[in-house]
């Protein structure tokens, strides 16, 4: 973990208040299980877990997110002096939370079970250094029965700037819950001057069983304040409100990379545009609502298939979902257009990694955006590749589409927090 912290915190200062730093990447749980030949077994266990939680999820008013699908992360710090954390970036939620010192009874962190089959170099990226050894099996592992044991945890007694908040929270995810209380302290992107004072954040005292399998500590929500539990102001909006940004933008660039963990999975720019990875020509799309980064998707096509409903669909940019979520009929038709085959046992679509297939074309705000096969044909170890789409059952509050990283790998996303719009810029 120390190596990861040192590398992920490398910073390039673009101007006084425009900063750019690396986004880390790790293949999502489905990709990792598929690479091990255990995707069917994983899906069976996961579906059984979800069925047990169905009543709880149906009655929950909190955003329902699949933590196991997340793949991109950044490093932040809280408190004075700084306590560092590695967090998933999630534009589909708006709260910041990390494990509290009382989670797992305040015990010292041990090596999580996810380190067991991790190659040495990747282990150094995502696990504590003492968990990693150069052996044939990979790394040594200390058993853990608590999801918090392998996490960095926030200790308020060590921070001179910490203030209590008094409010509690309970966030429901597809594969578990996160419960705890809110606190207030200084937030920074680690080893930078990009800091916001008085940031309200969640201190988790209990996290669901699925979280133990993930090396990251928590989540930083990039959505709008209206989406936040208890209406807390998200960190990026706090930075804007406190005048810490040159422009009210943050930009997400995601690189096209293979099925292995990477320090350089992309770039996260705050306070201005990303002129290194993204075209200077930005197409601005008005938002439908200021909750998700949600907008109207006019249509989609690929080869001979084309679909454009009269009223379009509501779609949201989503850094958390590794694939693209869409209505079942659309996913089935797109899969047919590119030659992908559904495998019921795994709940996923597969296709030839070297297949020459047409682009998938989206119509947004009257303009067309081509997504090449390099973005939606995803390698997941030996064997065929995965088609990076999944069926999304949406209703009511939720958009019909979640345009995840496959689309973001083709177009940088510029989030304008002041004017309520989303910019799309072609990746250079």
Swiss-Prot record:
Induction: By heme deficiency. Synthesized in the intestine. When secreted in low heme conditions, localizes to neurons near the anterior and posterior regions of the body and in coelomocytes. It comes from the Eukaryota. Residues 72-425 form the Peptidase A1 domain. Keywords: Aspartyl protease, Disulfide bond, Glycoprotein, Hydrolase, Protease, Secreted, Signal, Zymogen. Residues 1-16 form the signal peptide. Its EC number is 3.4.23.-. Proteolytically cleaved. One of its GO terms (biological process) is apoptotic process. Pfam families: Asp. GO terms for molecular function: aspartic-type endopeptidase activity. The active site is at 90, 318. Its main location: secreted. InterPro entries: Aspartic_peptidase_A1 (IPR001461), Pepsin-like_dom (IPR034164), PEPTIDASE_A1 (IPR033121), Peptidase_aspartic_dom_sf (IPR021109). It is found in: Secreted. Disruption phenotype: RNAi-mediated knockdown in larvae results in defective heme accumulation in the intestine under low heme conditions. Double RNAi-mediated knockdown with hrg-4 or mrp-5 in larvae results in defective heme sensing. Disulfide bonds join 353-385. Belongs to the peptidase A1 family. PANTHER family: ASPARTIC PROTEASE 10, BETA-SITE APP-CLEAVING ENZYME, ISOFORM A-RELATED. Aspartic protease which plays a role in heme homeostasis and mediates inter-organ signaling between the intestine and extra-intestinal tissues when cellular heme levels are low. This is Aspartic protease 10. It comes from Caenorhabditis elegans.
């Amino acid at each position: 973990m120390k190596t990861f912290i040192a590398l992920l915190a490398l910073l390039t200062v673009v101007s006084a208040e425009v900063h750019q730093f690396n986004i880390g990447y790790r293949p999502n749980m489905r990709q990792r299980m598929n690479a091990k030949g255990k995707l069917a077994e994983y899906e069976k266990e996961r579906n059984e877990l979800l069925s047990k939680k169905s009543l709880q999820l149906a009655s929950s008013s909190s955003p329902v997110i699949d933590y196991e699908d997340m793949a991109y992360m950044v490093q932040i710090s809280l408190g004075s002096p700084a306590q560092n954390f590695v967090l998933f970036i999630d534009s589909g939620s708006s709260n910041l939370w990390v494990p509290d010192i009382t989670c797992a009874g305040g015990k010292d962190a041990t090596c999580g079970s996810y380190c067991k089959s991790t190659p040495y170099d990747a282990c150094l990226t995502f696990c504590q250094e003492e968990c990693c050894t150069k052996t044939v099996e990979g790394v040594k592992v200390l058993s853990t029965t608590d999801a918090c044991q392998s996490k960095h945890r926030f200790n308020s007694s060590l921070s001179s700037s910490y203030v209590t908040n008094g409010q509690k929270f309970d966030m429901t995810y597809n594969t578990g819950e996160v419960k705890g209380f809110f606190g207030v302290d200084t937030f920074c992107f680690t080893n930078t001057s990009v800091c916001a004072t008085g940031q309200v954040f969640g201190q988790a005292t209990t996290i669901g069983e699925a979280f133990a399998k993930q090396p990251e500590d928590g989540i930083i929500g990039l959505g709008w304040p209206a989406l936040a539990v208890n209406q807390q102001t998200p960190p990026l909006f706090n930075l804007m409100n406190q005048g810490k940004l040159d422009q009210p933008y943050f930009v997400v660039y995601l690189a096209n990379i293979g099925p292995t963990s990477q320090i350089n999975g992309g770039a996260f720019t705050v306070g201005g545009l990303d002129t290194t990875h993204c075209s200077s020509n930005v197409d601005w799309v008005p938002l439908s609502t200021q909750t998700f980064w949600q907008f109207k998707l006019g249509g989609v096509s690929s080869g001979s298939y084309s679909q454009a409903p009269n009223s379009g669909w509501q779609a949201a940019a989503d850094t958390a979902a590794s694939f693209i979520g869409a209505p079942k009929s659309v996913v089935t038709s797109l899969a047919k257009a590119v030659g992908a085959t559904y495998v019921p046992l795994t709940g996923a679509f597969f296709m030839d990694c070297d297949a020459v297939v047409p682009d998938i074309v989206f119509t947004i705000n009257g303009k067309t955006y081509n997504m090449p096969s390099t973005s939606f044909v995803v390698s997941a170890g030996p064997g065929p590749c995965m088609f990076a789409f999944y069926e999304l059952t949406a209703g009511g509050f939720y958009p019909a589409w979640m345009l995840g990283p496959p689309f973001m790998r083709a177009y940088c996303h510029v989030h304008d927090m002041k004017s309520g719009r989303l910019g799309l810029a072609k990746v250079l």
